[in-house]
Amino acid sequence: AIASLAEQFHSTVVLCTATQPSLDDLLRTYAPGCPATELCPRTAALYDKFRRVRFRQAGTLTDEALAEELSGMEQVLCIVNSRKAAQAVFTRLPKEGGFHLSTLMIPAQRQALLGEIRQRLIDGLPCRVVSTSLIEAGVDVDFPAVYRELAGLDSVLQAAGRCNREGKRPPEESLVTVF
């Protein structure tokens, strides 16, 4: 269909996405004869620049096991799929440096907590945050480790964007754990 569009209507087709896979094989198979031109120069260098984390699959974790892992870390973000799950994990964490974010909070309360969280991250103080997916988009925080309950790839990648966001740590020290 793409090849027909380009050929019959003398069109240029632009394919773009935030997480673009290699298109060479797809174009060779489904759009033979359609030349592909990379619009973004030096993509290999860009991939290297944005390779800031490594991923780990932890399998299924109980609330207790998850809270135990989180408690062993000084600074960590944990994103779960429901408010109920967030509350269940949060109540098992040490009180010092523990934060719970939910859409049930009024925006001003969330903003105040996010300000405190950012400051603790900067100061190197304990900061263990349990949140729903509200923190995945539009929230600028940088954790050394992120735990993400299994969700769609887009959600996992958004969560990964909260780990080593500023690129100050090597990827080997910036772990995104999917459970």
Please provide the spans of the model-predicted regions.
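ASCE RecA-like P-loop NTPase motor cores
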Residues: 1-11, 19, 93-96, 107, ...
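Interdomain hinge/linker at the junction between the two RecA-like core domains of SF2 helicases
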Residues: 4, 8, 12, 16-71
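Short glycine-/polar-rich loops that comprise or flank the Walker A/P-loop
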Residues: 9-11, 48-53, 96-97, 141-144, ...
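Conserved nucleotide-binding/hydrolysis micro-motifs of P-loop NTPases
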Residues: 13, 19-23, 59-62, 83-86, ...
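Conserved strand-helix element at the start of the C-terminal RecA-like helicase core
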Residues: 71-94
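Conserved helicase motor
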Residues: 81-84, 98-115, 130-136
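Conserved two-lobed SF2 helicase motor
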Residues: 121-136, 148
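Conserved segment of the helicase C-terminal RecA-like domain
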Residues: 125, 158, 162-179
